[in-house]
């Protein structure tokens, strides 16, 4: 009798506990939505990333020579190149204290990008991004002679290829090469587009970098205007438009310091 009674009380206690935490979660979500509406109305990305902007300015100054050399090598405008990844530099400094990728790296090496795909380094490049660039260059080898070193030899096993790719993405020099290859790919893939201004071109290339150049043209156009940065489309808090931040930097880089 007492055993049954005790079990009943225990079950009720657990049920009430679950209800309490469920209500707590619902309340938190409602509070977040309410706060988000206010935040979106009062925050600019300049104030939201105030501390990150200072760190990014120092990073760009420290690596100015390296970035200019790469831009000169591949005949790209340095400010245009930097603007594309400027939002990612902000994001990197925003989340770096929470980054732990060792487990994901092992999972990626063993199973591939479909199982584990995550952002790496200051430019926040994912393994799948590098893979797509390598595949595009290999498919159009005649037009991408200057980027042929990005192609990983097929003799290497898939695990070794992934390990090498991860090692590359942890180095700034390689990330810069992938970045310039990305711009060259956009020039090649979207050659039919006629941009009125360089800013319009940047807006498209930045949106494309944000969601992936392999996505459909209409999806990229849509992303030019969406406030899904820095936490993705499912996040309910303060968000900004990736392409707009890139353009703001390009128009007046000194104001971002």
Task: Show which residues each predicted segment covers.
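Leucine-biased recognition of intrinsically disordered, low-complexity hydrophobic segments
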Residues: 15-16
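Catalytic glycan-binding domains that act on GlcNAc-containing polysaccharides
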Residues: 43-257
């Amino acid at each position: 009798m007492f055993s049954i009674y005790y079990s009943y009380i225990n079950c009720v206690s657990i049920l009430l506990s679950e209800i309490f935490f469920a209500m707590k979660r619902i309340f938190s979500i409602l509070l977040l939505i309410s706060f988000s509406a206010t935040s979106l109305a009062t925050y600019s990305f300049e104030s939201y990333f105030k501390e990150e902007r200072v760190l990014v300015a120092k990073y760009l100054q420290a690596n100015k020579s390296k970035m200019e050399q790469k831009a000169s090598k591949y005949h790209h405008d340095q400010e245009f190149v930097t603007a594309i990844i400027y939002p990612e530099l902000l994001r990197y400094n925003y989340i770096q204290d929470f980054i732990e990728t060792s487990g994901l790296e092992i999972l990626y090496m063993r199973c591939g990008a479909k199982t584990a795909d995550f952002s790496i380094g200051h430019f926040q490049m994912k393994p799948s991004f590098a893979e797509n660039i390598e595949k595009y260059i290999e498919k159009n080898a005649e037009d991408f002679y200057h980027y042929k070193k990005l192609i990983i030899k097929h003799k290497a096993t898939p695990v070794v290829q992934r390990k090498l790719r991860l090692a590359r993405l942890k180095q700034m020099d390689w990330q810069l090469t992938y970045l310039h290859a990305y711009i060259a790919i956009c020039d090649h893939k979207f050659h039919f587009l006629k941009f009125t201004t360089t800013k319009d071109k940047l807006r498209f290339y930045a949106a494309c970098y944000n969601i992936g150049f392999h996505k459909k043209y209409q999806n990229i156009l849509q992303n030019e205007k969406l406030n899904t940065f820095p936490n993705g489309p499912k996040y309910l808090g303060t968000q900004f438009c990736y392409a707009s931040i890139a353009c703001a930097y390009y128009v007046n880089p000194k104001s971002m310091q």
